[in-house]
C-alpha cells in the first residue's frame, strides 16, 4: 500500500540521516588517513541480539589443523560460529578461510602476527597488523570483515596507554 511504502521510505530516510550524523560526529583522529577502507557503520552492540538471547560461538587464533574438523562438527549440528583468525598468505590458510566463508560462518580479524609487544607498540603498529590480517581475509574470501577481537583481549597488560588509544581509534572506525 501507499501508506506502507511511505513508512518504509521515512524509515530509510531516517536511517540515512542517522548514518550521516554518526559519520559527521565522529571525532577527527590523527590516524584517519591510515587504512580508510577499514571503516564500518555497524553498531558495536545490538539490543535485538540481546532480546533474542542469542549465544555466539567463537574460535580464536586459527585457522589451524583443526579447522576442517570444527567445520564438520558445526555442519553436523547446524551451528554457525565466528572465527577470529591469525591468517597468513599460504595456500593452506586461504583454503581454510574460503571453507569457513563457504560454510556460512563469520570471519573476523584477530591479528596478523599475534606478537603483543609489536602489535601494542603504537596505534600505527596495531593498524598495520590489523590491516595485514584484514587484507588477507579479503584476498582469500572477498569479505570485507567488520568484526575483530583484540589479541590478548581489549583489557590486557600490554602498554595500557597505547591500548587505550587503539580502543579509541577502533571505536571511531565503527
Show where each model-derived region lies.
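Active-site glycine- and acidic-residue-rich loops that bind
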Residues: 155-161
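Short flexible/disordered coil segments
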Residues: 149-151, 173-174
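Intrinsic disorder/low-complexity detector
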Residues: 12-20, 35, 39, 43, ...
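Intrinsically disordered, low-complexity serine/threonine-rich repeat tracts
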Residues: 1-29
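His/Asp/Glu-enriched short active-site or ligand-binding loop at hydrolase and phosphoryl-transfer sites
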Residues: 163-174
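Non-catalytic interaction surface on structured domains
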Residues: 75-77, 160, 167
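Active-site beta->alpha N-cap acidic-glycine motif
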Residues: 27-150
Amino acid at each position: 500500500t501507499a501508506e506502507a511504502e511511505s513508512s518504509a521510505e521515512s524509515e530509510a530516510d531516517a536511517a540515512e540521516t542517522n548514518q550521516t550524523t554518526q559519520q559527521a560526529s565522529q571525532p577527527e583522529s590523527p590516524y584517519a588517513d591510515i587504512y580508510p577502507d577499514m571503516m564500518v557503520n555497524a553498531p558495536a552492540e545490538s539490543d535485538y541480539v540481546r532480546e533474542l538471547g542469542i549465544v555466539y560461538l567463537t574460535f580464536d587464533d586459527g585457522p589451524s589443523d583443526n579447522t576442517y574438523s570444527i567445520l564438520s562438527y558445526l555442519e553436523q549440528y547446524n551451528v554457525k560460529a565466528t572465527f577470529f583468525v591469525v591468517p597468513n598468505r599460504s595456500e593452506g590458510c586461504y583454503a581454510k578461510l574460503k571453507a569457513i566463508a563457504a560454510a556460512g560462518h563469520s570471519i573476523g580479524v584477530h591479528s596478523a602476527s599475534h606478537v603483543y609487544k609489536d602489535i601494542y607498540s603504537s596505534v600505527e603498529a596495531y593498524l598495520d597488523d590489523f590491516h595485514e590480517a584484514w587484507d588477507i581475509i579479503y584476498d582469500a574470501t572477498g569479505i570485507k570483515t567488520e568484526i575483530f577481537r583484540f589479541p590478548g583481549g581489549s583489557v590486557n597488560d600490554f602498554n595500557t596507554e597505547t591500548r587505550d588509544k587503539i580502543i579509541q581509534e577502533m571505536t571511531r572506525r565503527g
